[in-house]
């Protein structure tokens, strides 16, 4: 049982109890998972800000459990904060902006491919602020939040099925616009990105960008995956939940925070590596979801015998 930092080491094999941490590095990290049971967690990155950390939209959080009998290659994308990405926006989908810092990137884990259509779990990034007091929207969660302050257009929230008004797309936040001495924030990345903001043209009016949405691939959410999905029912996550960036969550370091601040983060906890020779644990598929059996029996000579 060991704890690894995937931004510093390459893990060649895993064991039950291992923790695979993936802080932001500006690039994805790959790890090969043998057949087993795994807990996936992702924290979205915070949107950029100019004068106060409180104005950058906070990132969301998502968690789910995967049971795989064939093993899988996992690609971990920890989003970059808007302040890390500067005007280009945070790594992994943060929306750019013409001046100041862009939107925060979403954080996600992809299975067997680096395609956006292989994302199995996503936490939305927050939108960047428009000006010194014009806040960006928080990331999702099932939905992000719109940029709430200032005057102008765009800055819509990413949702479960669409990008936010202002150029949010599948995986990326929209760009913030500067005009007439006003500044619009960039949208946060995520399942669907938040919209970038365009301030009105009446003067020095600023507006924050929208937050991106989150997603977990489950038996109930799979139907909302857009055309081109590279996942299948054997990869449904269970025990899944999401929290938006305005909710109380546990940070990667174990402290309590309201939404995630700073750069994004991914974590895989190895709950169990399956041993084909052990017999138990056994899993049964019910309504498309793999569940662990608490006991099992085999019929021999017309008699049922409990497996030990």
Please provide the spans of the model-predicted regions.
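Short beta-strand-to-coil "C-cap" segments at the C-terminal boundary of structured domains/repeats
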Residues: 65-67, 111-114, 217-219, 267-274, ...
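Surface-exposed intrinsically disordered loops and tails
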Residues: 87-95, 148-165, 169-171, 222-255
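Extended extracellular/luminal ectodomain segments enriched in beta-structured repeat modules
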Residues: 32-39, 69-73
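Glycine-rich strand-loop-strand elements at beta-sheet edges
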Residues: 25, 44-109, 129-156, 188, ...
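Aromatic sugar-binding interfaces of carbohydrate-active proteins
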Residues: 173-252
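Enriched but not universal
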Residues: 1-32, 226-308
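Intrinsically disordered, low-complexity terminal/linker regions enriched in Pro/Ser/Gly
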Residues: 136-183, 276-280, 287-308
């Amino acid at each position: 049982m060991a704890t690894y930092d995937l931004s510093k080491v390459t893990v060649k094999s895993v064991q039950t109890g291992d923790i695979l941490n993936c802080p932001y590095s500006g690039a994805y990290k790959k790890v090969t998972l043998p057949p087993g049971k795994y807990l996936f967690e992702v924290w979205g990155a915070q949107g950029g800000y100019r004068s106060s950390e409180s104005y950058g939209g906070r990132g969301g959080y998502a968690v789910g459990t995967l049971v795989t009998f064939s093993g899988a290659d996992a690609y971990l994308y920890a989003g970059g904060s808007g302040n890390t990405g500067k005007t280009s926006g945070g790594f992994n989908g943060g929306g750019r902006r013409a001046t100041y810092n862009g939107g925060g990137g979403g954080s996600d884990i992809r299975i067997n491919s680096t395609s956006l259509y292989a994302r199995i779990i996503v936490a939305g990034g927050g939108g960047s602020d428009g000006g010194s007091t014009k806040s960006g929207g928080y990331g999702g969660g099932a939905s992000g939040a719109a940029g709430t302050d200032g005057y102008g257009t765009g800055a819509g929230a990413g949702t479960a099925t669409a990008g936010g008004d202002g150029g949010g797309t599948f995986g990326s936040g929209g760009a913030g616009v500067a005009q007439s001495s006003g500044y619009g924030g960039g949208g946060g990345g995520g399942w669907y990105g938040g919209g970038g903001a365009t301030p009105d043209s009446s003067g020095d009016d600023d507006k924050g960008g929208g937050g991106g949405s989150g997603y977990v691939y489950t038996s109930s959410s799979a139907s909302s995956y857009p055309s081109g999905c590279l996942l299948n029912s054997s990869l449904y996550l269970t025990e899944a939940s999401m929290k938006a960036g305005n909710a109380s969550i546990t940070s990667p370091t174990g402290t309590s925070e309201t939404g995630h601040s700073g750069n994004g983060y991914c974590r895989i906890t190895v709950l169990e590596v399956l041993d084909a020779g052990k017999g138990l644990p056994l899993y049964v598929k019910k309504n498309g979801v793999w569940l662990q059996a608490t006991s099992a029996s085999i019929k021999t000579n017309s008699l049922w015998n409990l497996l030990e």
